[in-house]
Amino acid sequence: MSYPPPVGDSIKLKVQASNDPEEAFTNRAYLPISSFSFLFPNVQSNLYTTNTNYIKIRVGANEYILSASPNKNMKPDSIALSKALRGWMYVSNNEEVYVEFYDPNPNICGSMKVSIDYLTKGKQGPKQDSQEIIGKIIDNFNSQYFTFGQLFYIKNSNSTFELRVEAVETNEVPTKDKGWAIISPATKIILQKMPGSLIDIETNGPLVVNQIFTSDWDFENMGIGGLDAEFRDIFRRAFSSRIFPPAIVKKLGVNHVKGMLLYGPPGTGKTLIARQIGKMLNGREPKVVSGPSILNKYVGQSEENIRMLFRDAEIEQKAKGDDSGLHIIIFDELDAICKSRGSRQGDSGVGDSVVNQLLAMIDGVESLNNILVIGMTNRKDMIDEALLRPGRLEVHVEISLPDEHGREQIFKIHTAKMRDQNALDKDVNLANYAHTTRNYSGAEIEGVVKSAASYAFSRQVDTKNIKNVEIKPEDIKVCDQDFKRAITEVTPSFGSTDNQFESYAENGIINYGPVFDKLLQSGNAFVEQVKKSNRTPMMSVLLSGRPGCGKSSLAATLAKSSEFPFTRIISPNDLLGYNESAKASKITKVFEDSYKSPMSCVVVDEIERLIEYVPIGPRFSNLILQTLAVLFKRTPPKGRKLLVIATTSNPDILKDMDIMDCFATVLSVPSISTAKEFQTVCFELGFTQKEASEAASFFTSPITIKQIIMIVEMARQEEGNFIDNFKMCLEDFNIRNF
């Protein structure tokens, strides 16, 4: 028997590929009989195929420990290594290596983390049993040495797999050959998939949290304020399940949320939230599209645009399955393309086809589980119902007007750079502005900040000498007065319409006695009840009385003094020229807007005029009547409160129409019915005490406030004695006959 020439304690051999394909699955080095006998002279032939014949292979400065077996069909000076071992050791065929006997120092492997993939990359196959594969690793490679990065092959269920050692932990601190350890039946094998692998296997690795969020984000840096609760809701519903490993979610039988709808008034930050969600997440940027941009003039192209948005998610899910990354698709102005099917008149059907295509892509026959579709709209009521069901856009988050704390956050965000540049004066108090700007949206608060800055800029500019402006950045200071002027300049869309209320009470309110005192106290009591009571979030009050007795003025005064953030008046004057349907829609919109504010007051003036009541016939609009009847009794959404104050001059008509039951109470607004009340009114209208006393002597029958004011003003236009003129006007208008 000829031996290869020894080099010290080792022999020099040339690397060759294994002759037998089955040798690739043993993770052993194969030696000629002569070389094996030289290194292991005392090993009996029945032990040739055990894993306890260890050799050390030196490749340059690197050393590798393997189990060895003899092969009689090899050249005398060669060593056979599998493709996996050659790739791991970075050696090629015919390269010379040094091999020596290795006396083991058994470092028992406590646990070994191994990644797995098909030997043929990109292959897909049936689901594999992880426990069966782990069992084969223990059986096939028991007593073999392993270390980090080592590659080896195994067979299971007629499939071949490549495995790579990701980590090795020993039970004891090794005395030599650190990083190497021997597999034993007690070794815990932790199996995981290689990156990009398509293998279908339930891994048993530690439950690692998916780091889908970046670690350094916060609301203020993102430019989002006042939406802490909304973000918590979004995180819980849409992202919490995605943090857990797919295997855990699959065990629970839970599907990820695939879509959410952000809705609310304009300017509240819906688009901003959706855009910033992409910055919160690790990985790819979201696709942001405007609803109208989906539509195309060519037949079928609109539907193709929808499919193209989901194409990347489809490809990755087919390639990676549950390990696919999250694809976010954001639709701005969703109501432009997803109106309820069948609601369009004279339509070509493209709109309905787009809705159908979107429904199929989100949750159709071949649904995707790696997408999150975010839609935004101001008109949730226009969206097709099928799109809002669970499995599609199932999470509905209302982005409402910010509260006081939220408004302060928004002010801080939009003045952050001013603070950094020391451009805010010391008297600026953002908390006060947040308290003042009730029902301002985020966009309107930004408008306030820009308006305040414009006042600061204007102080540095001489309008008479614009060409020679000397810019001194250090002199630009935004002060408290700038913000106060800006707040009066920028009015909220969902705020109080003070100008409208002032026109209803131009002459103010005259307290003419105990009767009016009681009436005013009752009205204020209802206001306080709505403010403080949690049991009555909705209160409807009817003010009834003769024309001109001051019902509208009293209703406007109660609404204005309530200091509710949202106050509106629905008056026949504002709906002049509208048809019945348009009037009903306008009335409904006012009430819908009121539900977006924490506390609201709506004044419905002259109900009989609104419903177009005419006694001849009689004739009235049943559509408007039923609209009012429903809205007067509808409970606002949770957390919202509404006070409705309506006025009428014909309560009997309303009773016949069965609308009186919609009101919690009816307050009668009386006319001036006593001489004492008449005297008080005259005094409040500018009479001297003597003139008021004399005028009261003319009083004989009830009269309304409006009539008294008209007569007083007419008397003042006449020449001569004012009291005589006043008496004459009373007689001319036959007021005594009332």
From Swiss-Prot:
Q: Which Pfam families match?
A: AAA (PF00004), AAA_lid_3 (PF17862), CDC48_2 (PF02933)
Any one annotated GO CC term? Golgi stack
Location(s) in or outside the cell: Cytoplasmic vesicle membrane; Endosome membrane
Any GO BP annotation: intra-Golgi vesicle-mediated transport
User: Which SMART domains does the entry link to?
Assistant: AAA (SM00382)
Q: How is the cofactor bound?
A: Binds 1 Mg(2+) ion per subunit.
Residues that coordinate or bind ATP: 507-512, 547-554
A GO MF term: metal ion binding
Top enzyme class of this protein? hydrolase
**CDD domains listed in its UniProt record:** AAA, RecA-like_NSF-SEC18_r1-like
Per the entry, which co-factors are needed? Mg(2+)
The alphabetized UniProt keywords are: ATP-binding, Chemotaxis, Cytoplasmic vesicle, Endosome, ER-Golgi transport, Hydrolase, Magnesium, Membrane, Metal-binding, Nucleotide-binding, Protein transport, Repeat, Transport
Q: Does the keyword Plastid apply?
A: no
Spell out the reaction equation it catalyses.
ATP + H2O = ADP + phosphate + H(+)
Please give the superkingdom of this protein's source.
Eukaryota
Give the membrane topology.
Answer: Peripheral membrane protein
Enzyme Commission number(s)? 3.6.4.6
Q: What is its main location?
A: membrane
Query: Quaternary arrangement and interactors, per the entry?
Result: Interacts with syn7A, snpA and snpC.
What this chain does, per the entry, is described as:
Required for vesicle-mediated transport. Involved in endocytosis and endosome-endosome fusion. May be required for transport from the endoplasmic reticulum to the Golgi stack, and for the fusion of transport vesicles within the Golgi cisternae. Required for cell polarity, locomotion and chemotaxis.
The similarity annotation says: Belongs to the AAA ATPase family.
Name the chain's protein.
Vesicle-fusing ATPase
Write down the species. Dictyostelium discoideum (Social amoeba)
